[in-house]
C-alpha cells in the first residue's frame, strides 16, 4: 500500500521528522523485511527512509533504521534487538540535517551527527521496499511526526 501525491506531501516534512512503528514478524530467515518506507518513487533504492526487521541486512533478530539520500547512505542503525517470531517490537527513527537517531524497545538511541537529507522522497510504502517485503507479520501501528522529536521522546515512544 502507498500514500502518494498531495496525500503524502500535505504531511511530509523533508527537513525533519520522526517515524514510530509497532510491528511483529512471523518469518525470521529473510532479511530486508521493511515495514515502513518513505521513498522516491522514481529511484526507490537511492532515496529512502526504512524501518523494520533486518532492514539493510543485519543478523537474525536485528532491527534496522536506514536513511539513504541522493544515492548515499546518510545513516544506518543496526539494533541487536533479539527479535523473535510473532513478538511485538517498537522502533522509532528521527531525522534532521546532521541530527539522526534511532531507538528500539525503549533502548538508548543510537545517533549520527552528520548527513545531508534527501529532497526527492515523495511517497510512503507499507510492507516492503526495493530489496524485499515483509513475508509474514503485522504492522500494529505507525505514527509520523513532522518534526524531529528528542532522543528521550524516541526512547519513551518505544518503551513496551
Predicted regions and their residues:
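Generic recognition of flexible, low-complexity loop/linker segments
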Residues: 6-10, 78-80, 88-91, 129-131
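Extracellular, beta-strand-rich glycan-interacting domains
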Residues: 17-27, 132-160
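Flexible glycan-contacting loops in extracellular carbohydrate-active proteins
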Residues: 112-138
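Surface-exposed coil/turn segments at beta-strand junctions on protein surfaces, enriched
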Residues: 12-14, 84-86, 117-119
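Extracellular glycan-interaction surfaces
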Residues: 52-115
Amino acid at each position: 500500500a502507498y500514500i502518494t501525491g498531495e496525500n503524502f506531501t500535505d504531511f511530509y516534512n523533508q527537513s525533519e521528522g520522526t517515524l514510530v512503528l509497532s510491528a511483529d514478524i512471523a518469518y525470521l530467515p529473510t532479511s530486508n523485511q521493511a515495514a515502513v518506507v518513505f521513498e522516491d518513487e522514481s529511484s526507490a533504492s537511492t532515496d529512502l527512509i526504512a524501518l523494520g526487521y533486518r532492514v539493510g541486512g543485519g543478523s537474525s533478530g536485528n532491527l534496522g533504521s536506514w536513511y539513504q539520500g541522493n544515492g548515499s547512505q546518510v545513516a544506518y542503525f543496526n539494533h541487536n534487538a533479539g527479535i523473535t517470531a510473532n513478538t511485538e517490537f517498537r522502533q522509532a527513527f528521527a531525522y534532521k540535517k546532521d541530527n539522526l537517531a534511532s531507538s528500539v524497545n525503549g533502548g538508548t538511541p543510537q545517533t549520527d551527527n552528520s548527513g545531508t537529507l534527501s529532497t526527492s522522497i515523495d511517497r510512503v510504502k507499507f510492507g516492503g521496499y526495493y530489496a524485499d517485503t515483509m513475508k509474514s507479520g503485522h504492522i500494529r501501528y505507525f505514527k509520523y511526526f513532522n518534526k524531529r522529536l528528542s532522543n528521550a521522546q524516541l526512547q519513551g515512544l518505544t518503551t513496551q
